[in-house]
């Protein structure tokens, strides 16, 4: 109450000239952010449909030296609330069925629907995908994010990473007298990661067929502390049945949070579901994805800086009773 009173006093103490100056500064900052996002949006539209069907002519040495590194996007120009209501009407675009989904727009140079098998639900700023990508270069990884500005940030980040890595790879090939030409791991350029604005709580089966995914990540989801908000948590009995549907037998659900109450909630619901079985601590210690998940996300790095705790639980998808008959 006292803080609010102090704030009111501070505002009332401002002169009309100071208030006018402050308003102009805020307006200039907002205009600058919008212009930055509009510029990135134009780049995004062009890059999204760049599909090379024929080998490009070899660049001359002079053109290679003029290739410039694309600037990575800046978070301050993508302001967004920390969380979004999953039950709101966000006017999202989604396919009627997985068969009608055109994945080639997201993975223009590495498209194969059978390989879309890793999903980061609520991917945030994309840190996990960017670390997982090189570890699974033959698999397609999709991040689902409901917030508009955050999704645009990740799109722009992936576009910049792809362009920059291709420049680096071309330079390495020229220095080594030419590449192998067989598309080995040395040619990796983040073509297997992509982000999509979507609501996993509503439309996940619209994107994936039964048993398509091998891994699902739920990293630092919204805890929804209030009792009446618990129905909006990303792990519930109903949603777990949907996750089990799109997850193949033996697939893994990865969860991590810095909120112990949410961790206990997720563990309770996963333990009670007949199609999931918790993996041991020994398994977690040996799995490279757990290590990446623990340290790669922006939220996880913030928890580390604040010396907070991280709670991990991983579950294996069990065979369905019908499949055992």
UniProtKB/Swiss-Prot annotation:
Q: Identify the InterPro entries for this entry.
A: SAM-dependent_MTases_sf (IPR029063), Trm8_euk (IPR025763), tRNA_(Gua-N-7)_MeTrfase_Trmb (IPR003358)
Q: Which CDD domains match?
A: AdoMet_MTases
Q: Region annotation Disordered: residue ranges? A: 1-101
Report if keyword Signal is assigned.
no
UniProt GO BP? RNA (guanine-N7)-methylation; tRNA methylation
EC number of this enzyme: 2.1.1.33
Question: Which residues are named in the active-site annotation?
Answer: 222
Q: Does the keyword Nucleus apply?
A: yes
Q: Which SUPFAM superfamilies match?
A: S-adenosyl-L-methionine-dependent methyltransferases
Top-level taxon of the source organism: Eukaryota
GO MF term (any one): tRNA binding
What is this protein for, i.e. what is its function? Catalyzes the formation of N(7)-methylguanine at position 46 (m7G46) in tRNA.
Q: What is this protein called?
A: tRNA (guanine-N(7)-)-methyltransferase
Provide the species name.
Candida albicans (strain SC5314 / ATCC MYA-2876)
């Amino acid at each position: 109450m006292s803080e609010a009173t102090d704030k009111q006093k501070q505002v009332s103490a401002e002169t009309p000239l100071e208030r006018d100056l402050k308003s102009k500064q805020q307006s200039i900052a907002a205009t600058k952010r919008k212009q930055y996002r509009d510029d990135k949006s134009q780049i995004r539209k062009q890059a999204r449909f760049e599909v090379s069907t024929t080998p490009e002519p070899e660049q001359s040495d002079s053109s290679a030296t003029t290739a410039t590194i694309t600037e990575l996007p800046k978070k301050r120009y993508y302001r967004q609330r920390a969380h979004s209501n999953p039950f709101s009407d966000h006017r999202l675009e989604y396919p009627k069925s997985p068969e009608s989904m055109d994945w080639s727009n997201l993975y223009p140079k590495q498209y194969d629907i059978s390989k879309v098998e890793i999903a980061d639900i609520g991917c945030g700023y994309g840190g996990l995908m960017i670390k997982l990508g090189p570890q699974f270069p033959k698999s397609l990884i999709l991040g689902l994010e409901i917030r508009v500005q955050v999704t645009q940030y990740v799109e722009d980040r992936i576009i910049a990473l792809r362009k920059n890595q291709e420049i680096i790879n071309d330079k390495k090939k020229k220095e080594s007298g030419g590449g192998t030409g067989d598309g080995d791991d040395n040619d990796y350029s983040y073509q297997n990661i992509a982000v999509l604005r979507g609501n996993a709580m509503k439309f996940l089966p619209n994107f994936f067929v039964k048993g398509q995914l091998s891994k699902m990540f739920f990293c630092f989801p919204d805890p929804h502390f209030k009792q009446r908000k618990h129905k909006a948590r990303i792990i519930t009995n109903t949603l777990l049945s949907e996750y089990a549907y799109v997850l193949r037998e033996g697939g893994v659900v990865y969860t991590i949070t810095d909120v112990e109450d949410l961790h206990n909630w997720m563990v309770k619901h996963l333990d009670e579901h007949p199609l999931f079985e918790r993996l041991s601590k020994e398994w977690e210690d040996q799995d490279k994805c757990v290590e990446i998940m623990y340290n790669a996300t922006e939220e996880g790095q913030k928890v580390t800086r604040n010396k907070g705790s991280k709670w991990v639980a991983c579950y294996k998808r069990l065979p369905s009773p019908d499949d055992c008959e």
